[in-house]
């Protein structure tokens, strides 16, 4: 038994010596990394080996564990004298930005992504959200697009533009300085104010796909028709799509209204300045209303001409509303055509409001609309006055009386 223990002790010591020799070779190979690192690597390797050996042979040699442990400590103590002390003062590492030569920077190992950073460095790290590959809203791209950021600052409503995917994709491809800035300067030259650019671009988002020279050509055409700069600015503001129409189409529209209504050039120009969407909207409602005035309501051509030049919206008004208003004013209130022609603004008034006021005047015995008789009630004042003035000037009653009467209807 003593012989067996002696043989095992020699075997264990030979294994330790082999480990030490290998560790010494590793130390020589890693000398460029520094003495401390070599010592730590060797000690770590040796410790791992010892732990493995202890874990494997504990059951077999438990009777000699105490003796082996003492032998191991003596060997470790002897071997440690051959290695640099771990407790030695570490060498000073040169600062990269000042002491390390530039030609040696390429030889430095790359920084590990797991390397700890200080709080100051962490604050300076900019974290950007990833750009979505696809999205149904432009809001996801605002942080990544200077163009969208500038448009938002101008007051453009991106939620309305994103309903049109083709236009939304176009905006994402445009460069603000190269593609959009020149159009903004062009609109400013036309007379649009800064606070008007956002609403304009929200409605006519397609202007970004227009060639700037074509836009200038259309403005030049309007100027050739004696539209002033103020007129053009007003028309563009109230009908944003105006500049998207070709010169040929603009010319055809002006010709249509001049011919259909038999207006002079000046009256035609005044008509479209007051309602510029006549040049951009559909002509079908206009043609339909012209037939209604002539065939259903019984107005003469010159009467229609007079009314639409005074109230241009009559050309695009809802057909049903027109007929209901005329029916009540003409057949219930007994107002003839020639008086309606003088006060066409009655067609801009809600039928419900006309009914309420007429019934209140009839209740008071003051519903008299014939200018040739006493106590005449002007149709103009009848529809244009607010309730307070209507009650005081026309009905000669209080607003409270008017409200009480309305509750009885």
Swiss-Prot record:
<dbReference type="InterPro" id="IPR038538">
    <property type="entry name" value="MTERF_sf"/>
</dbReference>
<feature type="transit peptide" description="Mitochondrion">
    <location>
        <begin position="1"/>
        <end position="64"/>
    </location>
</feature>
<dbReference type="GO" id="GO:0005759">
    <property type="term" value="C:mitochondrial matrix"/>
</dbReference>
<dbReference type="GO" id="GO:0000976">
    <property type="term" value="F:transcription cis-regulatory region binding"/>
</dbReference>
<dbReference type="InterPro" id="IPR003690">
    <property type="entry name" value="MTERF"/>
</dbReference>
<dbReference type="GO" id="GO:0045892">
    <property type="term" value="P:negative regulation of DNA-templated transcription"/>
</dbReference>
<protein>
    <recommendedName>
        <fullName>Transcription termination factor 3, mitochondrial</fullName>
    </recommendedName>
</protein>
<dbReference type="GO" id="GO:0006390">
    <property type="term" value="P:mitochondrial transcription"/>
</dbReference>
<dbReference type="GO" id="GO:0061668">
    <property type="term" value="P:mitochondrial ribosome assembly"/>
</dbReference>
<feature type="region of interest" description="Disordered">
    <location>
        <begin position="74"/>
        <end position="93"/>
    </location>
</feature>
<keyword id="KW-0690">Ribosome biogenesis</keyword>
<comment type="function">
    <text>Binds promoter DNA and regulates initiation of transcription. Required for normal mitochondrial transcription and translation, and for normal assembly of mitochondrial respiratory complexes. Required for normal mitochondrial function. Maintains 16S rRNA levels and functions in mitochondrial ribosome assembly by regulating the biogenesis of the 39S ribosomal subunit.</text>
</comment>
<keyword id="KW-0496">Mitochondrion</keyword>
<dbReference type="GO" id="GO:0005739">
    <property type="term" value="C:mitochondrion"/>
</dbReference>
<keyword id="KW-0804">Transcription</keyword>
<comment type="similarity">
    <text>Belongs to the mTERF family.</text>
</comment>
<dbReference type="Pfam" id="PF02536">
    <property type="entry name" value="mTERF"/>
</dbReference>
<keyword id="KW-0805">Transcription regulation</keyword>
<keyword id="KW-0809">Transit peptide</keyword>
């Amino acid at each position: 038994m003593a012989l067996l223990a002696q043989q095992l002790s020699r075997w264990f010591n030979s294994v330790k010596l082999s480990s030490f020799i290998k560790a010494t070779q590793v130390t020589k190979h890693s000398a460029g990394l520094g003495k401390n690192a070599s010592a730590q690597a060797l000690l770590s390797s040796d410790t791992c080996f010892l732990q493995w050996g202890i874990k494997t042979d504990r059951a077999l040699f438990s009777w000699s564990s105490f003796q082996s442990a003492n032998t191991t400590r003596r060997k470790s103590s002897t071997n440690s004298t051959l290695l640099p002390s771990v407790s030695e003062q570490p060498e000073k590492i040169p600062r990269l930005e000042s002491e390390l030569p530039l030609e040696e920077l390429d030889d430095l190992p790359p920084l590990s992504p797991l390397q700890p950073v200080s709080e100051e460095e962490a604050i300076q790290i900019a974290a950007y959200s990833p750009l979505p590959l696809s999205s149904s809203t432009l809001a996801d791209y605002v942080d990544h697009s200077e163009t969208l950021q500038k448009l938002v600052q101008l007051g453009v409503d991106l939620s309305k533009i994103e309903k049109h995917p083709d236009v939304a994709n176009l905006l994402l491809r445009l460069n603000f300085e190269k593609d959009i800035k020149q159009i903004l300067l062009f609109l400013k030259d036309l007379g649009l104010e800064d606070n008007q650019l956002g609403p304009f671009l929200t409605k006519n988002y397609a202007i970004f796909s227009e060639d700037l020279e074509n836009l200038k050509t259309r403005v030049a055409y309007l100027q050739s028709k004696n539209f002033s700069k103020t007129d053009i600015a007003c028309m563009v503001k109230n009908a944003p799509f105006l500049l998207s129409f070709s010169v040929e189409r603009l010319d055809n529209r002006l010709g249509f209204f001049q011919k259909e209504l038999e207006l002079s050039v000046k009256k035609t120009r005044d008509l479209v300045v007051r309602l510029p969407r006549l040049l951009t909207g559909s002509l079908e409602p206009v043609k339909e209303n012209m037939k209604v005035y002539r065939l259903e309501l019984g107005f003469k051509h010159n009467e229609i001409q007079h009314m639409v030049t005074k109230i241009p919206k009559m050309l695009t008004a809802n057909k049903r509303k027109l007929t209901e208003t005329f029916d009540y004013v003409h057949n219930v209130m007994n107002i003839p055509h020639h008086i309606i022609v003088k006060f066409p603004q009655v067609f801009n008034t809600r039928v419900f409001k006309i009914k309420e006021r007429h019934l209140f005047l009839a209740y008071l015995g003051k519903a008299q609309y014939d200018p040739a008789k006493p106590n005449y009630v002007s149709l103009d004042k009848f529809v244009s006055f607010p309730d307070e003035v209507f009650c005081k000037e026309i009905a000669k009653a209080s607003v409270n009386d008017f409200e009480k009467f309305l509750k009885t209807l």
